Amino acid sequence: RLTINLDMNHVDLERNNGLTIYGNSPKDTKIVRGIAAKFSDVHTDLSSKYSVNVNEIPSTAMPYNSDHAPFVYEIDNQPDDGMEYGKALVCYGSGSSEYHTYLDTMDRFNEESLAVSGIILGSFIRYLSYGERV
């Protein structure tokens, strides 16, 4: 149903404090946007420190530069009858710029920032599993 890519999702506070979550399903991004708003209300300590942007983009604009790409672009075995795209949510943090460079070391890693995407997307996964039950 959905691929969630949490690769390179930590924040480098020397660069900025942002996380970006984007996806190609209007329904999914709307739900995640609502979860992110609730996250800001409940986890004020983290939300005051880290900003979260949730964006919806068309399937044809999904980047083909990370692990989620085959699950978006390569699920249709017969594209001649009209391309069918897979759904994906992707989270990148400002720390992703160091990926595979000399700065990609654990001393620059910000484990606290992983809680932000973990709580938001973990809540979404729970929603997919159980619905709106409390």
Residue ranges and their predicted role:
Residues G95-V134:
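His/Asp/Glu-rich mid-to-C-terminal helical/loop segments that flank catalytic regions of hydrolases
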Residues R1-V90:
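Metal-dependent peptidase/peptidase-like ectodomains
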